[in-house]
C-alpha cells in the first residue's frame, strides 16, 4: 500500500513518537493573551514563547499527521495527501530533534527552524485540494460529509499553527510597524482593511472582465480595534470578489449600470460586524447548504492533475477550487467570530462577517 511505503521513509521510532505526542493535550491561546504577552518582546519573553512552542507545536503537528494517515475512502492513499502527510512528519521530526531551549542563542536557532517549517507548509491548502479532487472523481456526494469535517478540523488547526509560528517570528522584527504586536495590529481600522481588500478584488475583476462594479463603504473611519489585518484582508477579499463576480455576470449584457457593492462596518459592544451586500441575483435556496463545503465547487481547479509533487511552488490561490468561503469562515471562527450568508434568489446576497471585539476567545482546538 502507498501509505505503508511512505511511512517506511521514516523510522518506526518517529512514527511511535508521533502517536505519543498526538495523544497529549493542546493548549489554546487567545488574541488578547498574544497581544499582552507580545507587547514586551524582551529576551526573557521570547525565551518563554519559544519554550511553549517547543512543546505545543509537536502536539498539534502530530495530531494532524495521525489524521492524515487514517482518512476514509482511500484519501490517505492519494499522492497529494501523502505529500502533505510527509511534510507534517518532516516538521514533527525537526521539532522533536531540537534540543531543550535554555538561552537566547537556542531561541534564535529555534526561531529559524520554525520559520523553515512554516515555509515547508506554504502549499498545504492547494495540495490537499488536489488530493480531494483526485478522490472526488470516484465518489458520490453522500460520502463526502466525513471528508468535509476532516478538512474543517485540518485547516482550522493549520491556521492556528501558522498564527503561533508567525506571531513568534514577527516579534523578532527590530522595526515593527506602529501599533503592531507581531501579526496583531492593536489599532486596526476595519474600514481601511475593507478598502484595501476591495481594491485588490476590483483589480482582479477588471483583469477578468474589463470592468468592475463600484464599491461603497460605510462606517466610522476613525474606529479601530485589535485584530490580525492579514486575516481580515483575506476574508474581505473573498467576500467582495464573490459579490463582484455575481454582479458582473448578472449585468454583463444589460443596458443598466451594474449596482454597487455595499460594505457596512458596525462596531458593537461584543462584535465588530461587516456586511457585504450585492445585487448579483442571489443563490438558490437549494444551493445554500453547499456554499461552505470544499467539495462541490463548479469552478475549474487551477491545479493540474499532472502537477509534479516534488515541486514546492504549486500556485498558492484560493480562486478556482471553491475554498474561499469555508476557509474564510474558519479564519473568522479562529478568534471567536463567524461568517453567515443570507441570500435572496432573484435579487442578491448579504454576507455578515462577525469579528469578536473582546479578543478573549480561546483558539478552537480540533
From Swiss-Prot:
CDD domains: HATPase_PDK-like (cd16929). Residues 122-359 form the Histidine kinase domain. GO terms for cellular component: cytosol; mitochondrion. Gene3D superfamilies: Alpha-ketoacid/pyruvate dehydrogenase kinase, N-terminal domain, Histidine kinase-like ATPase, C-terminal domain. Optimum pH is 7-7.5. Keywords: ATP-binding, Kinase, Mitochondrion, Nucleotide-binding, Phosphoprotein, Pyruvate, Transferase. Autophosphorylated on Ser residues near N-terminus. It is an enzyme of class 2 (transferase). The modification Phosphohistidine is found at residue 121. Expressed constitutively and ubiquitously. Its main location: mitochondrion. Changing residue 241 to A: Reduced activity. GO terms for biological process: protein autophosphorylation. Homodimer. Serine protein kinase that inhibits the mitochondrial pyruvate dehydrogenase (PDH) complex (mtPDC) by phosphorylation of the E1 alpha subunit on Ser residues, thus contributing to the regulation of glucose metabolism. This is [Pyruvate dehydrogenase (acetyl-transferring)] kinase, mitochondrial. It comes from Arabidopsis thaliana. The gene is PDK.
Amino acid at each position: 500500500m502507498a501509505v505503508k511505503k511512505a511511512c517506511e521513509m521514516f523510522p518506526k521510532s518517529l512514527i511511535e513518537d508521533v502517536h505519543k505526542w498526538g495523544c497529549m493535550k493542546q493548549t489554546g491561546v487567545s488574541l488578547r493573551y498574544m497581544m499582552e504577552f507580545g507587547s514586551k518582546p524582551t529576551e526573557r519573553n521570547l525565551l518563554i514563547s519559544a519554550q511553549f512552542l517547543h512543546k505545543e507545536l509537536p502536539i498539534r503537528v502530530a495530531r494532524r499527521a495521525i489524521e492524515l494517515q487514517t482518512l476514509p475512502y482511500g484519501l490517505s492513499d492519494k499522492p497529494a495527501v501523502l505529500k502533505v502527510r510527509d511534510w507534517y512528519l518532516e516538521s514533527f521530526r525537526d521539532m522533536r530533534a531540537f534540543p531543550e531551549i535554555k538561552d537566547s542563542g537556542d531561541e534564535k536557532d529555534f526561531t529559524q527552524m520554525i520559520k523553515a517549517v512554516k515555509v515547508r507548509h506554504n502549499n498545504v491548502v492547494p495540495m490537499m485540494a488536489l488530493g480531494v479532487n483526485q478522490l472526488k472523481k470516484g465518489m458520490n456526494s453522500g460520502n463526502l460529509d466525513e471528508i468535509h469535517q476532516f478538512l474543517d478540523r485540518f485547516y482550522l488547526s493549520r491556521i492556528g499553527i501558522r498564527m503561533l509560528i508567525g506571531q513568534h517570528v514577527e516579534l523578532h522584527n527590530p522595526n515593527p510597524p506602529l501599533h503592531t504586536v507581531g501579526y496583531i495590529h492593536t489599532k486596526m481600522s476595519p474600514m481601511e482593511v475593507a478598502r484595501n481588500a476591495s481594491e485588490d478584488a476590483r483589480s482582479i475583476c477588471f483583469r477578468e472582465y474589463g470592468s468592475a462594479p463600484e464599491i461603497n463603504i460605510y462606517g466610522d473611519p476613525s474606529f479601530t480595534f485589535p485584530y490580525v489585518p492579514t486575516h481580515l484582508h483575506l476574508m474581505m477579499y473573498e467576500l467582495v470578489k464573490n459579490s463582484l463576480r455575481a454582479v458582473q455576470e448578472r449585468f454583463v449584457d444589460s443596458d443598466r449600470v451594474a449596482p454597487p457593492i455595499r460594505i457596512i462596518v458596525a462596531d458593537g459592544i461584543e462584535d465588530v460586524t461587516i456586511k457585504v451586500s450585492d445585487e448579483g441575483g442571489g443563490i438558490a435556496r437549494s444551493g445554500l447548504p453547499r456554499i461552505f463545503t470544499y467539495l462541490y465547487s463548479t469552478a475549474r481547479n487551477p491545479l493540474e492533475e499532472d502537477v509534479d509533487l516534488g515541486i514546492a511552488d504549486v500556485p498558492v490561490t484560493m480562486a478556482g477550487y471553491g475554498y474561499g468561503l469555508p476557509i474564510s469562515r474558519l479564519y473568522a471562527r479562529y478568534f471567536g467570530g463567524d461568517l453567515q450568508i443570507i441570500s435572496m434568489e432573484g435579487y442578491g446576497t448579504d454576507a455578515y462577517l462577525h469579528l469578536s471585539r473582546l479578543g478573549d476567545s480561546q483558539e478552537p482546538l480540533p
